[in-house]
Amino acid sequence: MNFSNILSNFFGNKSQRDLNEISPFVQKTLTIYSSVENLSNDELRGRTRELMILLQKEIEMEKNKIDELKILVESLELEDRETVWNEIDEIEKDIIEKQERILDKILPEVFAIVKDTARRFAENETIEVTATDFDRQLAVFYDFVSIQNDKAIYQNHWFAGGNEIIWNMIHYNVQLFGGIVLHNCNPKKYIKDIEGHNFSKKIKGYIAEMATGEGKTLAATLPVFLNAMTHNGVHVVTINDYLSKRDSEWMGPLYMFHGLSVDCIDKHRPNSNERRKAYEADITFGTNSEFGFDYLRDNMAVNPQDLVQRKHNYAIIDEVDSVLIDDARTPLIISGPVAKEDDQLYVLYRSRVENLVNVQKKLTNNLLIEAKKLMALEDPKQHEEGLKLLFRSYKGMPKNKALIKYLSEPGIKMSMLKTEEFYMQQQNREMYIITDELYFVIDEKNRSVELTDRGIDILTGNSDDPEFFVLPDLGTKFAEIENELITKEEKQLKKDELMQSYAAKSERVHTINQLLKAYCLFEKDDAYVVLDNRVMIVDEQTGRIMEGRRYSDGLHQAIEAKEHVKIEAATQTFATITLQNYFRMYRKLAGMTGTAETEAGEFWDIYKLDVVVIPTNQLVIRNDKDDRLYKTAREKYAAIINEIITLREHGRPVLVGTTSVEISELLSRMLNMRKIHHNVLNAKLHQKEAEIVAQAGQTGTVTIATNMAGRGTDIKLSTKARDAGGLAIIGTERHDSRRIDRQLRGRSGRQGDPGSSVFFISLEDDLMRLFASERIAKMMDKMGFKEGEVLEAKMLNNAVERAQKKVEENNFGIRKRLLEYDDVMNSQREVIYKRRHHALIGERIGLDIINMIYDVVNSIVEQYSNFNDYKGLKSELYKTLAIEPPISEEEFKNMKTTHLTEVIFNTSIVNFKWKNEQIVQIVQPRIERAYKEVGNKYQNIIVPITDGRKIYNVSYHLKTVHDTKSREIIKSFEKAVLLSSIDEAWREHLREMDELHNSVQNASYENKDPLLIYKLESFNLFKNMIDTMNKRVISILMRGQIYIKNQEVREATPEKKTNYNHYKVRKDELIESGRIQGRTAKRDTRILQKIEPIRVEKTVRRNDPCPCGSGKKYKNCCF
């Protein structure tokens, strides 16, 4: 017995302790529930309204204070506003904490109300209440509500997910436990609250592990209802759009009955008014990726009206392990086209790589044949030589089926592993003996392929350049150039040519490597499928097609070239975020799943989410049998077919879980040969999913499914199937993750139903080959395991679980490394998106500009004071800030840097305010006249502003400009400049960060940590980007002046929403067009069919056509 087991015996395990602490709270809920049952329907709803009013009344004073401060801040000087905004931020935090304390206090009563509402719907076909305005609105859109006179009639049946359901569910006690956990409760706090003590805590997140069939969806209604009462927004996150739509319709009436609004973002187009309204609902359902993409789209919006999301308040994630662990490695990306087109390289070099792979296959097959011959001899030296050839064959083509079969013979695998250990000694010092004879070397565990000199020779062929695919040593080549007796200009020319050659060769080598990976590591119908002439990735966890997802770094193009389908264009990232960092933005985060305990460490390390295991409502009586091990995959599949036939004859439904489309189709063909009727559910047939799952619990039904993880629909047994022994689960191999195996097992034995599960495995399975080889091989040899035999032992199960732990640890390392890289980007993203949001909304834009001016002044002072360069300072101040130095050269040399910064900053602020006042004074009379004469005709107007180099035609709302005494013009101009500058700088920065991420990986060859280099270099890139952007923005704003002097204001078309229809949209890719475009004055600007909200033009010359559209020359019109 290990130490943790000893502790558990004395103190109970963690989940038991958590549940013991929650139990008194559950008892209090049940006590209130017994009294709530006696209330009338109207009294029940009335109590909910009273609690919602209480939540708003308690924070009324704070909200009024915020309104007062927002009025005050407009009257303050720009530099004095920061203190007030900080005070507003603190009050908003106080509001959230105050509401949270109230929610904790009323939680028992609210849970009792929800439970009793569920009971009333379950026990009554209709529920009659006094109609409210909300009821009348519902009756217009939903069939389950009708209005008769002053009464609203709620029915207990409605449509959800395309099927009519009759409500028949009432919360079990275990679901109350789950609801408490999902509300993000610290159980100890509740005991203190119940006893009347004050208790404050920092809000944490919790995950409720609830077994399949235990009603996670119903349990979530408790915390969702409670938190929605604040009207701050609750997001219920699912893994696919079918579940989000179904659950919103299924649980919606429970919430709507009490006046809470419910919507689903997946029912509406991105960036539409309907989707915006969905986010304004009290409860919003949606898929994880759509929530993430809406966040990215909001941070590409050009008008406040384009924003759809509110603040990230509280989210409950269904199948949380699938979202936060399985999907966490894939970032969400919005991207656009790049100028570079290297797609043809994949087609150009495809035939060379195909030839190389075929040559290697022939070589490794011959090596295997020769190895078998030598190893059959009794001579020890010949045997040793045979092992060397066997290991070489393995390094060249580890997935060779003949090799895999031979390695399953007694003693062979163990002998090869010892040979591998010998050549790996002293950091692979002797490995060249094995690899030099190959054309390339495959590392299946790390998914890498490395070319050898022989491989390069084959690829080069008859090329004139023997080093066509060899990267030169730049350091050595640069040194050789420096030593040549030529001019400095000739040296520079040679260096440029060398760099161009290096870049071209890098691209070629990269293309070859990606093609080799595509041919050797990624198999069709396993990692991907080809549908409609497109390569589509299959999710290894769920078996679903990952619509729109593409492998990065050119790998997807390589697979497309391999499969001879159209190669889609490469893209450049415009906006990106990982699901890890998106969901960490929520103030409160909770999750539910049937399998979280094995990943509890990762949930805590990355998300600070604590896992609590909720007991089942009824004891699980499923029979989980020991794994059955076979020598070869052929024997295993034959045994599976026999097992299916036996179970079917007993009248039991059978669910066969496979890990790939290929295996599901293989088993399907084998069953067809035996004339066994069955259903197949895999990535190619996902449209029939709901129908197939609904039939899977009928007696004698056979269902083959690719990884049932996250299917979201319970398999309900017929009476005959239950009597026959329940659902039988057959796993065709162990998955890399224990969670996926547990999810498959969990499909059987729901709510106390009978059932069984067993996994069939072979020595040829990927998991066994790569991670369980040595221990299993020893076990096989000791037992004298022969072909055709089956092994069942607890020791085998333990060995397999240890192998799975190895894989899980490796995958966790990958995810954590990804997060460490993205954390660098995340801190930068937060700065940029916060500044962009301030510019878009406009409330804090003035404060941000003041801070930017200070940063620019500080940067200029530091740059020139270090060298006592007064002339340089003078030139830069005029160029960037449009001011003369407020100090003499003598003062510049003697003044401290901090004092100098303050003096120049104060002068810049004075000039900035004066410039803005000049614009207002010039334009105000024209605005007054326009408002009187055409105010009822024009809605938007254009007031061009120029910085002397470009014209910014910004559209303004005429009434708003008039009401603000033309100061709205200043704010809108600032907003236009800021948004365009931020977007341009951020896109370029993302491109540079992508390039940096790729380049720093080479640091590992120099025994340096790529992440450390990435952090240092990315900080410098970000600092330079901010400095450049600040100078560009401030330079434009400091020089801004009204362009029209003798012309009245013109009408503009209304501001348009960001048109996402122009973008190329995929699940993780989106193409965006530019927002502000410069136009030369020589182009015809007389006819403007559409006036965009923001547009930039170069300065118009005297003899150019006037931009006002009069047809006259500029000098005779508006000059």
Curated annotation (Swiss-Prot):
Q: What does the subunit comment say?
A: Monomer and homodimer. Part of the essential Sec protein translocation apparatus which comprises SecA, SecYEG and auxiliary proteins SecDF. Other proteins may also be involved.
Q: Which InterPro entries match?
A: Helicase_ATP-bd (IPR014001), Helicase_C-like (IPR001650), P-loop_NTPase (IPR027417), SEC_C_motif (IPR004027), SecA (IPR000185), SecA_CS (IPR020937), SecA_DEAD (IPR011115), SecA_motor_DEAD (IPR014018)
> What is written in the cofactor note of this entry?
May bind 1 zinc ion per subunit.
The disulfide bridges present are none
**CC per GO annotation:** cell envelope Sec protein transport complex; cytosol; plasma membrane
* Biological process according to GO: intracellular protein transmembrane transport; protein import; protein targeting; protein transport by the Sec complex
Location in or out of the cell:
Cell inner membrane; Cytoplasm
Question: What topology does the record note for this protein and the membrane?
Answer: Peripheral membrane protein
Matching CDD domains:
DEXDc_SecA (cd17928), SF2_C_secA (cd18803)
The highest taxon in the source lineage is Bacteria
Function (record text): Part of the Sec protein translocase complex. Interacts with the SecYEG preprotein conducting channel. Has a central role in coupling the hydrolysis of ATP to the transfer of proteins into and across the cell membrane, serving as an ATP-driven molecular motor driving the stepwise translocation of polypeptide chains across the membrane.
- List the Gene Ontology MF annotations in alphabetical order: ATP binding; metal ion binding; protein-exporting ATPase activity
Give the UniProt family note. Belongs to the SecA family.
User: Per the record, what are the reactions this protein catalyses?
Assistant: ATP + H2O + cellular proteinSide 1 = ADP + phosphate + cellular proteinSide 2
| Classification via SUPFAM superfamilies | Helical scaffold and wing domains of SecA, P-loop containing nucleoside triphosphate hydrolases, Pre-protein crosslinking domain of SecA
Q: Which gene encodes it?
A: secA
Q: What is its EC number?
A: 7.4.2.8
UniProt keywords (A-Z) are: ATP-binding, Cell inner membrane, Cell membrane, Cytoplasm, Membrane, Metal-binding, Nucleotide-binding, Protein transport, Translocase, Translocation, Transport, Zinc
Q: Which organism is it from?
A: Azobacteroides pseudotrichonymphae genomovar. CFP2
Main enzyme class: translocase
Give the PROSITE patterns listed for this entry.
Answer: SECA, SECA_MOTOR_DEAD
Q: Which SMART domains match?
A: SecA_DEAD (SM00957), SecA_PP_bind (SM00958)
Primary place of residence?
membrane
Required cofactor names: Zn(2+)
Q: Where does ATP bind?
A: Q175, G213, E214, G215, K216, T217, D714
- Pfam families of this UniProt entry? P-loop_SecA, SEC-C, SecA_DEAD, SecA_PP_bind, SecA_SW
Q: What is this protein called?
A: Protein translocase subunit SecA
Could you confirm whether the keyword Cytoplasm appears in this record?
yes
